[in-house]
């Protein structure tokens, strides 16, 4: 299971380091101190992950087993690539048998077993390129996409929710029956139309706040489990569940 990191690391660095006063603004210095002293950042370096976000996925998987049995995975908003690193391992993806496709408009350094597309997911050609890259029907669609923040919470929420909606629509179009969809969202309410669509197409829908998400962050994750398939026009399922986890 994914365990909470300890307060020290093997390099001897201790939590609580201060950043020397330079020309950095106070807010930038506080962010840098928090980043340096973040135990998940330190653990990511020790375990070879590109970002602390790896532990969010691992923590969610510990409880919900969304990676179990996955044979092909698509990672949206993948930079710098920690989720794709995990996906490559669980699918046994190799350069000769690619089973993971990742997309981001930012550059991503190569990851063994991952086909990387440097492209905006909102580009009309992106869905077809992803499906060609992954080489088959995915069991899991991951989205860590978030719009650049403006500092205006309502605007940031609306923009990120749009990305979540586009990702959800893509997942419903491409997932294998029984597959799962996981996407970043922000606190502030998920649009009813999106929740209704997910509950029509998946057996269970949950909001999750992993312990590895910073406590002050408005970030949450929307998990839709057990895709019902595309063989019939979806109807509202009274048994579909929706819940929120801490």
Curated annotation (Swiss-Prot):
| Top-level taxon of the source organism | Bacteria
Gene3D superfamilies with a match to the protein in the record: Vaccinia Virus protein VP39
The reaction(s) this protein catalyses? uridine(2552) in 23S rRNA + S-adenosyl-L-methionine = 2'-O-methyluridine(2552) in 23S rRNA + S-adenosyl-L-homocysteine + H(+)
Binding-site positions, S-adenosyl-L-methionine? 81, 83, 104, 120, 144
Q: Which residues form the active site?
A: 184 (proton acceptor)
Keywords from the named record: Cytoplasm, Methyltransferase, rRNA processing, S-adenosyl-L-methionine, Transferase
Care to name a GO molecular-function term for this sequence?
A: rRNA (uridine-2'-O-)-methyltransferase activity
How would you classify this enzyme at the top EC level?
transferase
- Chief localisation class: cytoplasm
Any one GO CC term of the record:
cytoplasm
**Compartment(s):** Cytoplasm
What the entry lists under InterPro entries is as follows: RNA_methyltr_RlmE, RNA_MeTrfase_FtsJ_dom, rRNA-MeTfrase_E, SAM-dependent_MTases_sf
Disulfide bond annotation, renumbered to this chain: none
Q: What is stated as this protein's family in its record? A: Belongs to the class I-like SAM-binding methyltransferase superfamily. RNA methyltransferase RlmE family.
Q: Matching PANTHER family, A to Z?
A: RIBOSOMAL RNA METHYLTRANSFERASE (PTHR10920), RRNA METHYLTRANSFERASE 2, MITOCHONDRIAL (PTHR10920:SF18)
Q: What does this protein do?
A: Specifically methylates the uridine in position 2552 of 23S rRNA at the 2'-O position of the ribose in the fully assembled 50S ribosomal subunit.
This chain belongs to the protein called Ribosomal RNA large subunit methyltransferase E
Organism of derivation: Agrobacterium fabrum (strain C58 / ATCC 33970) (Agrobacterium tumefaciens (strain C58))
